[in-house]
Amino acid sequence: MHIHIISVGKLKEKYLMQGIDEYKKRLSSYAKVDIIEVPDEKAPEHLSEQEMEQIKQREGERILAKIPNDAYVIALAIEGKMKSSEQFAASLDKLATYGKSKIAFIIGGSLGLSKQVMQRADEALSFSKMTFPHQLMRLILLEQIYRAFRINRGEPYHK
């Protein structure tokens, strides 16, 4: 399986980089993992609804340009479906069974994802009704992907 994590913004925090590197290393025996960063739009504090949509649109165009044509796309969004770790593992296993060898996870910027990105997504996944920093979400996502592979292989880890 080839996993693409497409995320808005550049990761700067060293402690997050270390965690991400650790999970990429752990995942290397299960899947190829690529993390693709697309530039975020600098935004002033007080934006109109129209300005927010324009920013999401520009970031969305960059995201869409990085999605492999044949990838199954999972957008991370608050309004997405919540799953337990076991349900998430089962859904990844099902995708593999149906020959979906490329999966692209999309993490938006601070304003979320554009309508176009959400339309391109095959599904929307929510980790919580809470909002997380998009940089931290990369680490959380990688940990859950790793956990899913361990669950699917019956290997100890997730309890």
Swiss-Prot record:
Signal peptide: none annotated. It is found in: Cytoplasm. CDD domains: RlmH-like. It catalyses: pseudouridine(1915) in 23S rRNA + S-adenosyl-L-methionine = N(3)-methylpseudouridine(1915) in 23S rRNA + S-adenosyl-L-homocysteine + H(+). Its EC number is 2.1.1.177. Its main location: cytoplasm. InterPro entries: Alpha/beta_knot_MTases, RlmH-like, tRNA_m1G_MTases_N. GO terms for cellular component: cytoplasm. SUPFAM superfamilies: alpha/beta knot. Keywords: Cytoplasm, Methyltransferase, rRNA processing, S-adenosyl-L-methionine, Transferase. S-adenosyl-L-methionine binds at L76, G108, F127, S128, K129, M130, T131, F132. One of its GO terms (molecular function) is rRNA (pseudouridine-N3-)-methyltransferase activity. Belongs to the RNA methyltransferase RlmH family. Homodimer. Specifically methylates the pseudouridine at position 1915 (m3Psi1915) in 23S rRNA. This is Ribosomal RNA large subunit methyltransferase H. It comes from Geobacillus sp. (strain WCH70).
